[in-house]
């Protein structure tokens, strides 16, 4: 039987984030800390970014979700992430991993494997090349950019789901969200300009953490988070272009629309297909 998911279900998760303001602990990369925090705030969540070994476990102890992003790696941060993973596993809170740049360097690949060996995440989100690399498939990554389409990574995503027994989200022109129950969602929202702002993908990962904090079904939470960002990106880009502005204005417009988006616009614009894989 095919999985079922109504647009109103997803909107109720958007409202839950706004109403409950979950605390999301992000150990993320230096490039995107500010934007990720603002995205979480605009969506209604509460961000905290702490990586000191002396406090990371305590911070996880008061958070409702943990987000790990390996964009700007160093040995200290890897150990911070491992400490956070152990604390999250002990508490049973959801963990979202963003393997930024997976496949680009041996060091990066080894760090990802260290994290996976420490504790398996609830959700892994990445572009096609990153997911293929984490799953052990051959893929060439250009920094944080993907050389593989999301559809090219579906086999790798399925393999990774089998390993983590969780959710894998492959971002691209079409976003694919798969889980161990063989549910498969495809989202076709968004705008090409979103790829020209640093941190949008990383912010998607942060949003997934916020949604997992309020929705125990991690697959549904991931679909809701990606749906929200896709629709918001579409609406924001159209408004910015209509004003004759560029991608700098889009960054601010994204935050505005995250706060202001209404149910009617969300459900009217959402392009979602749900099936089994």
From Swiss-Prot:
Pfam families: HK. Its cofactor is Mg(2+). One of its GO terms (molecular function) is magnesium ion binding. The keyword Transcription regulation does not apply. It catalyses: 5-(2-hydroxyethyl)-4-methylthiazole + ATP = 4-methyl-5-(2-phosphooxyethyl)-thiazole + ADP + H(+). It is an enzyme of class 2 (transferase). It comes from the Bacteria. ATP binds at residues 125, 171. Its EC number is 2.7.1.50. Substrate binds at residues 49, 199. Keywords: ATP-binding, Kinase, Magnesium, Metal-binding, Nucleotide-binding, Thiamine biosynthesis, Transferase. Pathway: Cofactor biosynthesis; thiamine diphosphate biosynthesis; 4-methyl-5-(2-phosphoethyl)-thiazole from 5-(2-hydroxyethyl)-4-methylthiazole: step 1/1. One of its GO terms (biological process) is thiamine diphosphate biosynthetic process. InterPro entries: Hyethyz_kinase, Ribokinase-like. Belongs to the Thz kinase family. Catalyzes the phosphorylation of the hydroxyl group of 4-methyl-5-beta-hydroxyethylthiazole (THZ). NCBIfam families: PRK09355.1, thiM. This is Hydroxyethylthiazole kinase.
């Amino acid at each position: 039987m095919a999985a079922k998911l109504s647009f109103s279900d997803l909107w109720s998760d958007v409202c839950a984030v706004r109403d409950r303001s979950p605390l999301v602990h992000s150990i993320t990369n230096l490039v995107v800390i500010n934007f990720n925090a603002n995205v979480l705030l605009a969506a209604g969540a509460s961000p905290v970014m702490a990586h000191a070994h002396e406090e990371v476990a305590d911070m996880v102890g008061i958070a409702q979700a943990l987000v790990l992003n390996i964009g700007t790696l160093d040995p200290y941060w890897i150990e911070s992430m491992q400490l956070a993973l152990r604390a999250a596993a002990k508490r049973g809170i959801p963990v979202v991993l963003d393997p930024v740049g997976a496949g680009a360097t041996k060091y990066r690949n080894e760090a990802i494997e260290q994290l996976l060996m420490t504790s398996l995440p609830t959700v892994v989100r990445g572009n096609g090349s990153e997911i293929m690399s984490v799953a052990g498939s051959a893929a060439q990554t250009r920094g944080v950019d993907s050389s593989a389409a999301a559809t090219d990574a579906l086999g790798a995503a399925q393999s990774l789901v089998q390993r983590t027994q969780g959710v894998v989200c492959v971002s691209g022109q079409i976003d694919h969200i798969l889980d161990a129950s063989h549910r498969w969602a495809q989202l076709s929202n968004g705008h090409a300009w979103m790829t020209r702002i640093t941190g949008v993908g990383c912010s998607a990962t942060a949003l997934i953490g916020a949604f997992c904090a309020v929705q125990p079904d991690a697959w549904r939470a991931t679909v809701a988070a990606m749906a929200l960002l896709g629709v918001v990106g579409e609406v924001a880009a159209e408004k910015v272009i209509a004003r004759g502005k560029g991608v700098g204005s889009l960054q601010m417009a994204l935050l505005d629309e995250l706060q202001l988006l209404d149910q009617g616009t969300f459900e009217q614009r959402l392009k979602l297909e749900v099936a089994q894989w």
